[in-house]
């Protein structure tokens, strides 16, 4: 499987059986810059914590950098 990986946001090969993930959360600059984003691959979908959104998928390049709606 190929997943986008941060910080470069490039598509890279991940080991067999892994899933791609997109993790987003707010930090102190969330209101002006939007949510922080972490893209990668893992053996299993990371555990969700309070205030953190995680989406996992299992097809090539299924975790693109999320777009932010402009006002």
UniProtKB/Swiss-Prot annotation:
GO cellular component, one term: extracellular region
Gene3D superfamilies from the UniProt entry: CD59
Subcellular location: Secreted
Transmembrane segments: none
InterPro entries: Snake_3FTx (IPR003571), Snake_toxin-like_sf (IPR045860), Snake_toxin_con_site (IPR018354), Toxin_cobra-type (IPR054131)
CDD domains: TFP_snake_toxin (cd00206)
Alphabetized PROSITE patterns for the sequence: SNAKE_TOXIN
Domain of life: Eukaryota
GO molecular function terms listed in the Swiss-Prot or TrEMBL record: acetylcholine receptor inhibitor activity; ion channel regulator activity; toxin activity
Main location: secreted
Keywords: Acetylcholine receptor inhibiting toxin, Disulfide bond, Ion channel impairing toxin, Neurotoxin, Postsynaptic neurotoxin, Secreted, Toxin
Disulfide bond entries: 3-20, 14-41, 26-30, 45-56, 57-62
Tissue: Expressed by the venom gland.
UniProt function note: Binds with high affinity to muscular (alpha-1/CHRNA1) and neuronal (alpha-7/CHRNA7) nicotinic acetylcholine receptor (nAChR) and inhibits acetylcholine from binding to the receptor, thereby impairing neuromuscular and neuronal transmission.
Family statement drawn from the similarity comment of this UniProt entry: Belongs to the three-finger toxin family. Long-chain subfamily. Type II alpha-neurotoxin sub-subfamily.
Protein name: Long neurotoxin 2
Record lineage: Eukaryota, Metazoa, Chordata, Craniata, Vertebrata
């Amino acid at each position: 499987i190929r997943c986008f990986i941060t910080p470069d946001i490039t598509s890279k090969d991940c080991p067999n059986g892994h899933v791609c993930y997109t993790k987003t959360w707010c930090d102190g600059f969330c209101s002006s810059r939007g949510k922080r984003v972490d893209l990668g691959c893992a053996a299993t979908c990371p555990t969700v914590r309070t205030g953190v959104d995680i989406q996992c998928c299992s097809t090539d390049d299924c975790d693109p950098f999320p777009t932010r709606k402009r006002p």
